[in-house]
Each structure stands twice: as C-alpha cells, then as structure tokens.
Swiss-Prot record:
One of its GO terms (cellular component) is cytosol. It catalyses: 5-O-(1-carboxyvinyl)-3-phosphoshikimate = chorismate + phosphate. It comes from Pseudomonas paraeruginosa (strain DSM 24068 / PA7) (Pseudomonas aeruginosa (strain PA7)). Keywords: Amino-acid biosynthesis, Aromatic amino acid biosynthesis, FAD, Flavoprotein, FMN, Lyase, NADP. NADP(+) binds at residues 48, 54. This is Chorismate synthase. Homotetramer.
Length: 363
C-alpha cells in the first residue's frame, strides 16, 4: 500500500513532484472552529522556502499556499482541508542529460527498481520539494496546539563539525541557519562559503522541542509517542537518524545519571526527552535529527546507467549544499502533526480519565 498518508485521526496526504505543475495536500481530521487563513500557513512556508540565502538552493519558489476547501468564513469546518502550492521555477532541461543515469546516493536507483518508471526531473516525488506540503499541514497542527498552550520550535544544533550550543530562542529566527547562538553565525557562513568553493556538501543536526505537552499522549505498544515521532521524523528527506532525549548518549550513562528523578517541585532532569514508556510525561518533548550531506554535487562520482554500464556522474541543477539549513521548519511540522494526532487519539479514548496525582511542573 502506498505511503503518502500519515496519521490516524489527524491525517495528512500529500502529492506532487519537484518539477510537476503543483504540490497538493489533503489535511483531514482537523477539529472545526479553528481560525485559519493562508497567512497562518505562509509564515512557516516562508521559513522553509528556497532561495532565501546564498547558502541554499537558488531555485526561486514563492511557495504561496492556497486553501481550496475545509475553511469557511475564516474557520475550519471539520471537513478535509485542501491545500495547493504551484511550482513556478522548474528547470527540467538541467536533468535531460541524466535521465538514464542514476545519481549516486539518490533515490533514482531504488525508485527505478520499485516502480519501473520514474520522473527523473529533480528527483520527482523523492525530492525534498515535497516537504513544502508537510510544512503547510504542520502549520495547521501548530496553530491548534498553540491554542492549548503547546509550542513546537526547532533549531540547528550542529553543521558538519561545528557544534552550536543553545543560547536563546530569540536568535533562531534572525539568521539563515536557525542557529540559537548568534556568535556562531560568522563561523557557519565561512564554513559554507568554503564548502561551495570545494564543490561539496555537508550534513547537519536539528533539534526540535515541544513545550506544554500534557502527560498521557502516546498509544502503547506499537504507537508509542517516541515511535511515532521517530517514524514521522525519519520520513523527512535526508534524515538518517533520530534521537529522543539523551538518545545514543545514554549508552555511556549509568542508571543513576540517566534516570529522571521526580520531586514535588518537578523532574530533576530530562534524559528521556519528555517520554516515559512511550507516553508523554509533561516534560518538554526533545528530538534530534541527523541529516546526511546532499548527494547532488558537481564533484564527479561513479555510477551506472539503466543498462548497468559504468558512468562518471556530475549532477547539474540547483541544490542545497546543506539540506539541514532548511530542515528546521520541516521537523517542527512533523512533530506538530504527530502531537495533534496523538492528542485527538487520547481525547477519543481517555477524555474522561481523572487522577488525583498532581502534574509535575516543567523544570
């Protein structure tokens, strides 16, 4: 069965290719009565769109979203919300010379074997261009969650060898890297400038945090909250790893260090990333994403053609030297979609559950 839909109650179905006429999405299950306009979605789309700095692809797409259905007089109706973003700056001729070649580390080879036919222009459906619809859908989820006091935010925590310490959220929206440390921006810019001169690319690490999440979200056993987050975040193009909380660092931790002890004043740590037993604890939800270097570089590489013959590949076109630079809004969107879906599932089964134990504050 095709995998173009995510969610159980709050569902997102997307369609469209990198060089097709448009991208579309159907968002179903959004509760009625939410005030919603195209501008609510456009804010996050503008954070993701290409061509916003010299460090990203120079493809110029306005990414202007149209709401086709599901909203009447400025409020959601509870019916499916149709979204559309038109592609306006395709240069398909850049790919005509490689239509019978497989770009190394791209999805060309695997799409060819899976479907027997593929849209070679810019990667077609496998292109990160598709993530624009995730961001649009995620903006709907973020707005609904915000009305409940839940805020989802992200930032870049590492670019290549450069680790970026968290200093302030205020810095994140003031630079092209979503860096929480303004003092690191000149170093990041210099690194990217040299990378472009080297005709190479680099990976990155993104951290995404949800605050205000109540205890109880997550559906053990198979739909645990951390499992659903890993599923959603790993579905983002170029993501090769996901950590929740301390993640792989917990391998070197002792139990006395890793366990998040409880006091009447709150948890003393958050190594679990806000999730215990697959269920939200009320602490901030923290996830980290590892994104690989983009494979579209002008440095020649070995590959084969559709006949299996060896070729030397030089990938032309307009590409991101670091896909992680624009990944923060995408990661936020996917976390928000997961949280709203889990919130609606919790509401559907356990809305009447009441316990006397107080909810511990976030530290």
């Amino acid at each position: 069965m095709s995998g173009n839909t995510y969610g159980k109650l709050f569902t997102v179905t997307s369609a469209g290719e990198s060089h097709g006429p448009a991208l579309v999405a159907i968002v179903d299950g959004c509760p009625p009565g939410l005030e919603l306009s195209a501008q609510d979605l456009q804010r996050d789309l503008d954070r993701r769109k290409p061509g916003t700095s010299r460090h990203t692809t120079q493809r110029q797409e306005a990414d202007e979203v149209e709401i086709l259905s599901g909203v009447f007089e400025g409020r959601t109706t509870g019916t499916p919300i149709g979204l559309l973003i038109r592609n306006t700056d395709q240069k398909s001729k850049d790919y005509s010379a490689i239509k019978d070649l497989f770009r190394p580390a791209h999805a060309d080879y695997t799409y060819h074997h899976k479907y027997g036919v593929r849209d070679y222009r810019g990667g077609g459906r496998s292109s990160a261009r598709e993530t624009a619809m995730r961001v649009a859908a995620g903006a709907i989820a973020k707005k609904y969650l915000a009305g409940l006091g839940i805020r989802v935010r992200g930032y870049m925590s590492q670019l290549g060898p450069i680790e970026i310490p968290f200093k302030t959220w205020d810095s994140v929206e003031r630079n092209a890297f979503f860096s929480p440390d303004p003092d690191k921006v000149p170093e990041l810019e210099a690194y990217m400038d040299q990378l472009r001169r080297d005709q190479d690319s680099i990976g990155a690490k993104i951290t995404v945090v949800a605050e205000g999440v109540p205890p109880g979200l997550g559906e053990p056993i198979f739909d645990r909250l951390d499992a659903e987050l890993a599923h959603a975040l790993m579905s983002i193009n170029a993501v090769k790893g996901v950590e929740i909380g301390a993640g792989f660092a917990s391998i070197a931790q002792r139990g006395t260090e890793h366990r998040d002890e409880l006091t009447p004043q709150g948890f003393l740590s958050n190594n679990a990333g806000g999730i215990l037993g697959g269920i939200s604890s009320g602490q901030p939800i923290v996830a980290h994403l590892a994104l690989k270097p983009t494979s579209s570089i002008t440095t020649p590489g070995r590959s084969i053609d559709t006949a299996g013959e060896p070729v030397d590949m030089i990938t032309k076109g307009r590409h991101d030297p670091c896909v992680g630079i624009r990944a923060t809004p995408i990661a936020e969107a996917m976390m928000a979609i997961v949280l709203l879906d889990q919130l609606l599932r919790q509401r559907g089964q356990n809305a009447d559950v009441r316990v006397d134990t107080p909810i511990l504050p976030q530290l």
